[in-house]
Amino acid sequence: MSSSQELYNRLNEKLREMVPVKNRKQVTNWIWVIVGILQSESCNLSQIGNCLPMDTKAESRVTLIRRWLSNSQVKVWPFYKKVLEHVLSGWSSVEVYLILDGVMVFGDRWQIFRVSLCHGCRAIPIAWTIVEGNGLVKVNKLKSMLEKVQRFMKRYVKQVSLLADAGFRDCDWAQLCRELGWNYAIRIACNTYITLPDGTSDRLDNWVPVNCNRYFQNVLLTRETKLQTNVSVTWTIDEKGQPEMVAIITNQIACRARLREYATRMSIEQSFGDDKSGGFDLAHTRLQHAQRIDHLLLGLSIATLWCHELGEFILKQGESARCLIDPSHERTLSLFQLGLRWLKRFLTTGLHFLPDFQACLSNLRLKPVVIPISQKPNV
């Protein structure tokens, strides 16, 4: 049996059980795309196609993939929602962090905006949308996605806190979070004007000395909008080694804990790294149509979920299992990388057990792997 067929068999039973469709080929070809992504560690269609165990020309295999990516009968959210329902079935008492961020693909033609769930000091995809062009995005572009996520998540978790960077600093984002019943922690620019409860108004960076933490309660944000919020401020070191202010607005009490919570947002940047050079090379996709990118992300998301699931499996087996793929005496690989390397070693050597995909994750909290001191905020 080919290694690709091994992976197919381990994905097949659970995905067909969760996503029943009349046309079985929709799921069959979906699984082959997932297999190709895992095998090739790439989102390039020719490389995905090269991993499919079919005695056909390369062009035919790529055509099969393209047809699935363009198939309007493949409903991305209904397919993926069924999987997420299974993944989150035991999370009803959990307060979760959702992380909103964007990444450019195909140069600057497309932006993928993704809501991800913090898991094991990384993040797994929950929902995404593709927007043409670059630059800051307005709240109306992503509102329907966030409302969809809210309707889904409220059935499976206790409370949601949304973390976002300064690309989402407009007051509209914070206001939408409150409408959705979510807490929020959003980074703002250091030159933002705030008005204190006593009526004093000035730029935020004029209030906070370098390398000092400050916490402001019940301030009004910006000169125009006057959003009432709380602000937590700390400092980190930028790429040039200079002090850089980190200011976070939140509906909760401004305090040190808010800064620690926001540090969780780094998980999504590292997870996009898993999608790109550290894993599946998403940035180099040459797809030019939003629908095809949307479908590709459906395959990539299942690949990511399985890697997280395998990472959990390895940690549950103990240090002896981790040391088979992680050469350090302490963990230096993310949950995603542990899972991906275990999968690759199984396919290469056949020496270790590879469990079937179960679409099951625990509310795992892990300490981060080693991070250079220069990247750590003063929290």
Where are these regions (language model features)?
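Single, function-defining residue in the core of a domain
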Residues: 1-42, 80-81, 94-96, 107, ...
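Short, positively charged, Gly/Tyr-enriched micro-motifs
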Residues: 24-72
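Hydrophobic, Leu/Ile/Phe/Ala-enriched alpha-helical segments that form helix-helix packing faces
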Residues: 52, 87, 149-153
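Active-site-proximal, Lys/Arg-enriched surface segment
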Residues: 62-122
